[in-house]
Amino acid sequence: MLPLSLLKTAQGHPMLVELKNGETYNGHLVNCDTWMNIHLREVICTSKDGDRFWRMPECYVRGNTIKYLRVPDEVIDKVQEEAKSRTDRKPPGVGRARARGGRDDSAVGRQPKGIGRGMDDGGAKGRGKGGPSAKSGGRGGGRGRG
């Protein structure tokens, strides 16, 4: 479970945020971004000593000042349930495109390819000098016009 997915799921729920300087903020999570910056509503801020309290309509907390986050257990359970259902839906690798080298010759509607240039394998003869009729003196083959 990733912290950002947990925070995205916790939107609208109450949470406690403790900062590195010791202050705590209790409020409802409105939003968070990829740097874990947090926007809270209906916030009660408690000083480091716990002797002063402030009520604020909303608050923005920078992500790199956060030491601790407490989210409700129901949010954690919901995220774990979503992760489990995601893994149950399809096994890893199903539905993904294969890499270039992983082509299967038995693919439906495809002819197997030759093994290389100029080989007598039924495939194309390549673009080298002289084609199949170059030595017999006929037209074609060769690089010149004549």
Curated annotation (Swiss-Prot):
SUPFAM superfamilies membership: Sm-like ribonucleoproteins
Gene Ontology cellular component list: P-body; spliceosomal complex; spliceosomal tri-snRNP complex; U6 snRNP
Functional note: Binds specifically to the 3'-terminal U-tract of U6 snRNA.
Annotated Gene3D superfamilies: 2.30.30.100
Main subcellular localisation: nucleus
Family the UniProt entry places it in: Belongs to the snRNP Sm proteins family.
Alphabetized GO MF terms: U6 snRNA binding
Name of the protein: Probable U6 snRNA-associated Sm-like protein LSm4
Compartment list: Nucleus
Compositional bias segments (type: Gly residues): 137-146
Composition skew (Basic and acidic residues), residue ranges: 80-91
GO biological process terms on file: nuclear-transcribed mRNA catabolic process; P-body assembly; spliceosomal snRNP assembly
